[in-house]
Amino acid sequence: MMAGEGSTITSRIKNLLRSPSIKLRRSKAGNRREDLSSKVTLEKVLGVTVSGGRGLACDPRSGLVAYSAGCVVVLFNPRKHKQHHILNSSRKTITALAFSPDGKYLVTGESGHMPAVRVWDVAERSQVAELQEHKYGVACVAFSPSAKYIVSVGYQHDMIVNVWAWKKNIVVASNKVSSRVTAVSFSEDCSYFVTAGNRHIKFWYLDDSKTSKVNATVPLLGRSGLLGELRNNLFTDVACGRGEKADSTFCITSSGLLCEFSDRRLLDKWVELRTTVAHCISVTQEYIFCGCADGTVRLFNPSNLHFLSTLPRPHALGTDIASITEASRLFSGGVNARYPDTIALTFDPTNQWLSCVYNDHSIYVWDVRDPKKVGKVYSALYHSSCVWSVEVYPEIKDSHQACLPPSSFITCSSDNTIRLWNTESSGVHGSTLHRNILSNDLIKIIYVDGNTQALLDTELPGGDKADGSLMDPRVGIRSVCISPNGQHLASGDRMGTLRIHELQSLSEMLKVEAHDSEILCLEYSKPDTGLKLLASASRDRLIHVLDAGREYSLQQTLDEHSSSITAVKFAASDGQVRMISCGADKSIYFRTAQKSGEGVQFTRTHHVVRKTTLYDMDVEPSWKYTAIGCQDRNIRIFNISSGKQKKLFKGSQGEDGTLIKVQTDPSGIYIATSCSDKNLSIFDFSSGECVATMFGHSEIVTGMKFSNDCKHLISVSGDSCIFVWRLSSEMTISMRQRLAELRQRQRGIKQQGPTSPQRASGAKQHHAPVVPPSGPALSSDSDKEGEDEGTEEEELPALPILSKSTKKELASGSSPALLRSLSHWEMSRAQETMEYLDPAPVANTGPKRRGRWAQPGVELSVRSMLDLRQIETLAPSPRGPSQDSLAVSPAGPGKHGPQGPELSCVSQNERAPRLQTSQPCSCPHIIQLLSQEEGVFAQDLEPAPIEDGIVYPEPSDSPTMDTSAFQVQAPTGGSLGRMYPGSRGSEKHSPDSACSVDYSSSRLSSPEHPNEDSESTEPLSVDGISSDLEEPAEGDEDEEEEGGTGLCGLQEGGPHTPDQEQFLKQHFETLANGTAPGGPARVLERTESQSISSRFLLQVQTSPLREPSLSSSGLALTSRPDQVSQVSGEQLKGSGATPPGAPPEMEPSSGNSGPKQVAPVLLTRRHNNLDNSWASKKMAATRPLAGLQKAQSVHSLVPQDEVPSSRPLLFQEAETQGSLGSLPQAGGCSSQPHSYQNHTTSSMAKLARSISVGENPGLATEPQAPVPIRISPFNKLALPSRAHLVLDIPKPLPDRPTLTTFSPVSKGLAHNETEQSGPLVSLGKAHTTVEKHSCLGEGTTHKSRTECQAYPGPNHPCAQQLPVNNLLQGPESLQPLSPEKTRNPVESSRPGVALSQDSELALSLQQCEQLVAELQGNVRQAVELYRAVTSYKTPSAEQSHITRLLRDTFSSVRQELEVLAGAVLSSPGGSPGAVGAEQTQALLEQYSELLLRAVERRMERRL
């Protein structure tokens, strides 16, 4: 009975699952997913991820070039400049690809675990076949000449060679290899194919008669090539001969040899390529192309290997592409110019074009019909490393004030460049940016320094591994932001340096080291706020607020977050200016601006804490709500005025990962999200419904922006690629309709009453939201977690800005900000429906509509059923509110650019076809109507000498080389004869031969049976995970490509295993603790480069209290490029009067009992990174502080010692009297209350947990008697510094390190540096009042900081203390001291401090240990620097000078130590104590000996 019931239940369940309703639901779900992915299409890819010749291919019939870009295959037509795309649905990176001989199909290999070999229909761009027989990545693939078979070779830990009959979907032959394989090539007659790799040339033979009859996998027969003298080489690429040389096989070695093998697998001859390294090869019947280092491509004759010519090299690294407007400048490089390496080649036999990819991620297509006259058909330059941020150039009301053409956007990258792009109007640039002939999409490259090494992808084969390993991984630009008026570009790098560029001249107008760590977010305030502020947020948990209207003077520094700050935004809500910030401490702070003197101060009004890390934030255009992307993949929406959470919905379709970025569109209808699973999604902001999904990036998407015309979404990623997505016509029309209705409402409000000109002009430039077509209102109780999830503090009421314009607006009651207070989901649906259905009043109200919305709304609704591209032909392109349609007469001639004459309908229509032909990816039938604004940017330049679109160099510029330099060599007699015994020897099985493998039932020896291989080959990894931990089986495997993780996930021939895709994930993980991953093994790397503010963290390590907040100041940072001082390597030599352990930059001024005035000046970052000699000192352990400072302004900058200078001051101090009235005096001992400067909720929770487990006990102690902590040199080095960017989401967030409790202080000044480089200063925070507690003793006597120690050295904070009233002096008091006053670094006095010159200066054991640790760190840094500069094959003049300087220093140190042998080392401040002197001397002698040995070994190797 029971059995019967069970069977009945089972049958019922089966029937239920088979029911039509279930199938219908499944089909609907599948259709739903398909609809979501079809809403947004990939229109253009700006980037390339080709890692070798296997990632580039050409259709021999049509000339179509295919290359990999993340998870996308780009099919590019060089003649038409058109792109089509194949998206890999598995979300795995494309590593190898090849065309079929007829060009109809494309085969791709991918990386990751259990990769697939896929065959795609090129015309349909759809998958037709799939093979999953590899486990650890596919290294290379190839079609047979008959297109019947496909051969695929796995990566190092896969070791499988498969021959696949892809139409039958069976593997006909297979075998294993014991070496890393880098390339594969089929013979012309399809009888064999050849693989090349590390000490590996292998010929694999196919018996078509046998393989066609057997349906099971048969052993693949292989024979090794006889390498002879070249047996220890790495063969990077191989190609079988064609035509008369079909029996030959050509390959190249990484050492720069071109080799030819005969049909007997015998090394016949070779020729040197005269290059340092060779990467790729392409063979035709007429030519052999060899891609080499420094952009070199050599041409040889395949019949005899005679040298023919060398192709022109591409652009030199660091080239200003905006200046390359003529063909004569294209091929002209400087004497010391450096070029990228050629890493991939493919030849188009139809057009005789050669496509090349270089390791700076640039693509060139050369016309090689005549080798003596090579022309450039096409070129493009892309980012070579992780792209961190993207910003869209704003719409400017007055087009004549615009610095960039419409539809431009800006990106920044780890390659240390900021790039300006314009894909819409290629060739139509601004007055200062003429069209260039290097790239159709790239307008300008801003190089932040002269380090060209950062421009190369060092993880590619073309990268120099030695140089790449010594490169600081923290270089690069992390964030960018454009001012609302389009005039300034702010950028923050990964070292904490803030730069401001003028976009009109593209010159650097300001450079200041604002933070101790990377700047994660920059934000300008919108014009509607009535303020011109710039907020800078960093990993060092500080926010600096600068006044852009007052030459970027520092207004305030906010110190409320307890961990990295991930986002900061401005908003105008309820007549108040707000600042919202969120961070990895799970806190959200809402602040309100308050007028203070001549500046603005932000005070906290709400503080909300959630249970998950907050990674990004955006404010919707109504400025009433802010959306925050969280670690749990939810989007939380908060009311800006109240700080209450109003809504929560899922921000990702997947079940893994975390939200990294969120971005609202200009109308506020949609919000786009980026998840760490590499997917993009677009949601309806009001309902939370997903409306579109996208994929294609192979790394985390680090930035997104909607275009101003609502047609595109631009995404940037860690894979170095930029994707331009085309939104569906329905989405675009709905967004444009909302913007049109908003402008009409604003126009109606302006007619009812006067408005402040400042606010009114700002409202015109900013898109405010309107009602969406549908969607419920947000409910305040929709959060599943509830409001009790976090704590909320309402400490201060909202404080209005008491400016005149604000008072007028509040009095009139007609401010546009009042309209913004209505969010688009809170407007009446009935009213919205009436406006949508009856747009006639919209079109007839007020003056005639102009600009982008010249078309009435009813016409938009009719056109909504058409393709969006057809709408473009009927309406002007929406460039900005000031744009006029063709029916509007243009402005007067005085307002025009270089064109001068007015643009009529006829003239624009005549110019439209010419513009269209220069636009890539535009449909050929579209006629782009030029608006008046576009006419401003049109440049009637003389065309470059182009023949059929090909740029040819002048004859003198064509590089030539003597053919006698390339001598063909053959093996010596008998050297191969002994190895090649004839026919008998040829029958001997090679180590990789299938005969050495025991097959059972004609099946391949699988990785599950590794012992079946009789030879000692490297076993396969069978655990299903990346085998990075496996030890290589052979000694030469140290060249494996999977040893490191690249910045963008690009490995030299290595797969993208899950372990190797962790770079960006790890970056975001460490946002919570502000430390770098790695541990002690990477201490040296972390301490090599520190920001200047890190040094002054040592000055506050003994401070028991934080100082109260100070008001704003008028310090103007007005540095120009000609005033920016650069410091050479010679300026790093310390002064002879510097006491032991004191870096040169911490020298005190002379002992003058009177008060001193100082001159803060701008301190620039040195491009050569030679300020690392005190890196170990910068990492000194710090004492826990007993208070947390919540806000601090510029007046808390520590006054620096006066220095002689011949340059004018870059900082001027003004208007400080009224803002410092409440400051305590310098010598005062009273303690002021800290108002709201208490622990944050998040920090208090962490503090309680730390105390409970015994961590950071100093934070819980009373501030009156902090206990001194002994610091060992090893602890100093182990402290965290700057961080990589890593994200391991499941891990709990660690407690905040002690180092993050200190506020960054002003950077120090080197005495000898300032003498040579002029005045220097930095932007930071410091203490301006003295402490009232003892630093070393346990007594309670109130003393100043300088009295705390018996020997306050120059590196101690006491030595840098100045009274606050000194800052109140006028500019006339800020004069540099004479050199006589700074002679004695020991003599120093401060107000309230009596320091005797004859005081006993005892050198304790602790100070001795500290000195030894610093000495060891300095020596280590010097050795590392010496290795770095001597590793360059062609050092520059500066590097040679550095080398000589270091050698001389080493020699002088050795001589001094020899002279002092047996003597006691003395201290400049007095005789040392008996304890520790002998140990110090012994350590010095031992370490000096080790240093000399290392230098000698290095010199011997170099010689």
From Swiss-Prot:
InterPro entries: MABP1, WD40/YVTN_repeat-like_dom_sf, WD40_MABP1-WDR62_1st, WD40_MABP1-WDR62_2nd, WD40_repeat_dom_sf, WD40_rpt, WDR62-MABP1_CC. Residues 905-917, 957-972, 1089-1129 have a biased composition (Polar residues). Ubiquitously expressed. Highest expression observed in brain. GO terms for cellular component: cytoplasm; mitotic spindle pole; nucleus. Keywords: Cytoplasm, Cytoskeleton, Nucleus, Phosphoprotein, Repeat, WD repeat. Residues 1058-1068 have a biased composition (Basic and acidic residues). SMART domains: WD40 (SM00320). GO terms for biological process: negative regulation of canonical NF-kappaB signal transduction; negative regulation of defense response to bacterium; negative regulation of interleukin-8 production; positive regulation of JNK cascade. Disulfide bonds: none annotated. It is found in: Cytoplasm; Nucleus; Cytoplasm, Cytoskeleton, Spindle pole. WD repeats lie at residues 89-130, 133-174, 176-214, 271-310, 337-376, 382-431, 472-511, 514-556, 560-601, 609-648, 654-693, 696-735. The keyword Phosphoprotein applies. Its main location: cytoplasm. Residues 745-817, 874-917, 951-1176, 1217-1238, 1369-1391 are annotated as: Disordered. Residues 784-796, 1028-1043 have a biased composition (Acidic residues). Signal peptide: none annotated. PANTHER family: MITOGEN-ACTIVATED PROTEIN KINASE-BINDING PROTEIN 1. Can form homodimers (via C-terminus). Interacts (via C-terminus) with WDR62 (via C-terminus). Interacts with MAPK9. Interacts (via N-terminus) with NOD2; the interaction is enhanced in presence of muramyl dipeptide (MDP). Interacts with MAPK10. The N-terminal WD40 domain is necessary for the interaction with NOD2 and down-regulation of NOD2 function. This is Mitogen-activated protein kinase-binding protein 1. It comes from Mus musculus.
